[in-house]
Amino acid sequence: MKRAVVVFSGGQDSTTCLIQALQHYDDVHCITFDYGQRHRAEIDIARELSLKLGATAHKVLDVGLLNELATSSLTRDSIPVPDYDANAQGIPNTFVPGRNILFLTLASIYAYQVGAEAVITGVCETDFSGYPDCRDEFVKALNQAIVLGIARDIRFETPLMWLNKAETWALADYYQQLDTVRYHTLTCYNGIKGDGCGQCAACHLRANGLAQYQNDSAAVMASLKQKAGLR
C-alpha cells in the first residue's frame, strides 16, 4: 500500500497537494500544526477539508514552543500584517523562522511511525514570497539530513515547487476541485476564508494567479501539464 503524509494547513497550496496526493496514494494522512498562529481558524478549516476530501487520518500537533521562539506578524497580534507592496524587498515580517524546518522534521517522524514513504509539502520557489525555507535547495538538504538521521528512505515531495500560482489553480481545476480550493480554503494572513481580505501579500498572490488562469485557462493548463507530466 502506498502511503503519504501531507503537511496540511488548509490553505490553497496544501489543499491542492492533498487533492493530488489522494489520486496517487492509497493511504493519505494529514498533519497540521498548532503554533499559536494568529489565523487559528486554519486548524478548523484543515479538519473540515481533510474529512471532506477523504484523508485517512488527520493529526493536529501542538507546537506552541515555536510561537515563543519565532517572532513574526503571524505569531504576534502586536505586529501588523503588511499590505501587499510590489516594491518590498528582503524577508517579510510574515516569515516564521524555522517553521518549515520544524514542520518537515515532525512530519517525517509521523511518517516513520505510520510507515509512509513520502512527506508532501506545498512549498513553492516560483512564488515563494521571499521565504528561505520554501526553496528547493533547502527542502532537498533537509530531506537528505532526515534520511540520514532516521535511517529510513522517506521522500519529500514538492509538487508545486516550480509552478506559478496560476498553474497551481490549474492543478486544482485539473482534478475538478477549483471551487473547493477557492471557497473552502484559508490562505489570507488576516484569517479570512475564501477570497480573503484582498490586501495582504498572500491574498494578492492568490487573486492574481486566479485572474491569470481565468484569463487564459487553456494556455495555463497546457503549461501545467508540460511541467507536471500530466495528460
From Swiss-Prot:
Gene3D superfamilies: HUPs
CDD domains named among the record's database cross-references: QueC-like
GO terms for biological process, alphabetical: queuosine biosynthetic process
Key words of the record: ATP-binding, Ligase, Metal-binding, Nucleotide-binding, Queuosine biosynthesis, Zinc
Record Pfam families: QueC
Residues that hold Zn(2+) according to the record: C188, C197, C200, C203
Cofactor note: Binds 1 zinc ion per subunit.
Top-level taxon of the source organism: Bacteria
Metabolic or biological pathway: Purine metabolism; 7-cyano-7-deazaguanine biosynthesis
Entry annotated with the keyword Nucleotide-binding: yes
Keyword Endoplasmic reticulum among UniProt keywords: no
Cysteines paired by S-S bonds: none
Cofactors named for this entry: Zn(2+)
Catalytic activity: 7-carboxy-7-deazaguanine + NH4(+) + ATP = 7-cyano-7-deazaguanine + ADP + phosphate + H2O + H(+)
Annotated EC: 6.3.4.20
Residues annotated for ATP binding in this entry: F8, S9, G10, G11, Q12, D13, S14, T15, T16, C17, L18
One GO MF term attached to the UniProt entry: ligase activity, forming carbon-nitrogen bonds
Annotated family: Belongs to the QueC family.
Function text: Catalyzes the ATP-dependent conversion of 7-carboxy-7-deazaguanine (CDG) to 7-cyano-7-deazaguanine (preQ(0)).
PANTHER family hit by this protein: 7-CYANO-7-DEAZAGUANINE SYNTHASE
Name by which UniProt lists this protein: 7-cyano-7-deazaguanine synthase
Organism whose genome encodes this protein: Pectobacterium carotovorum subsp. carotovorum (strain PC1)
Lineage of the species this protein comes from: Bacteria, Pseudomonadati, Pseudomonadota, Gammaproteobacteria, Enterobacterales
